[in-house]
């Protein structure tokens, strides 16, 4: 059984029309934002990268209900503008689907730095970590993850290089950053770990 695992499944509403993101090995890839409602009523605004052949089979317009399966990917942004680590969902399947919102991810990888346990101003425990999930051909995705409460305490006991296998959801979070006296709003994307699991629980 392959130890590394990365599978995300999303169902939500397209916020915008797909725009060309980049071309790789002659294949064009497009980017759009998928809005996925939480139970609280707040929505996660998640960037999706989709190959052109999938878009030709299933065109996407703003307001369309969309179901996606794929992988959560990271890209090291060396332009000096925006986030240094760019996180997006790479779509491997794409269909029209207006059913209930869905947001879940299954990951198995290794911790590439020591988990950091801290308390929020309201006294709730939270643990930050970076999970490295290997792809084929020697590449890896470095995925920011957070855990809360009892799960935060549990994963904080792990050390760099330890394997973490977990189920969670992908979330967006808006924060403010001040540079040279100018404050701007930015959006971070991360995995909220719901529970550690056994690898045998994952869909194949």
Which ranges hold each PLM region?
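Single-stranded nucleic acid-binding surfaces, predominantly the OB-fold ssDNA-binding core
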Residues: 1-204
């Amino acid at each position: 059984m392959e130890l590394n695992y990365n599978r995300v499944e999303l169902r939500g509403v397209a916020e915008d029309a797909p725009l060309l993101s980049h071309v790789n090995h002659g294949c064009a890839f497009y980017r759009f934002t998928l809005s996925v409602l939480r139970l609280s009523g707040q929505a996660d605004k998640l960037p999706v990268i989709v190959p052109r052949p999938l878009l030709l089979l299933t065109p996407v317009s703003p307001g369309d209900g969309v179901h996606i399966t794929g992988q959560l990917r990271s890209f090291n942004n060396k332009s000096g503008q925006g986030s240094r680590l760019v996180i997006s969902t790479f779509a491997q399947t794409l269909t029209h689907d207006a059913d209930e919102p869905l947001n879940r991810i299954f990951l198995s990888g290794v911790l590439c730095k020591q988990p950091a346990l801290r308390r929020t101003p309201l006294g709730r425990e939270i643990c930050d970590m970076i999970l490295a999930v290997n792809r084929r051909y020697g590449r890896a995705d470095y995925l920011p993850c957070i855990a809360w409460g009892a799960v935060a305490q549990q994963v904080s006991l792990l050390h760099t290089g330890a394997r973490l296998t977990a189920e969670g959801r992908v979330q967006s979070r808006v924060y403010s950053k001040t540079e040279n006296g100018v404050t701007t709003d930015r959006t971070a994307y991360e995995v909220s770990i719901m529970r550690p699991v056994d690898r045998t629980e994952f869909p194949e």
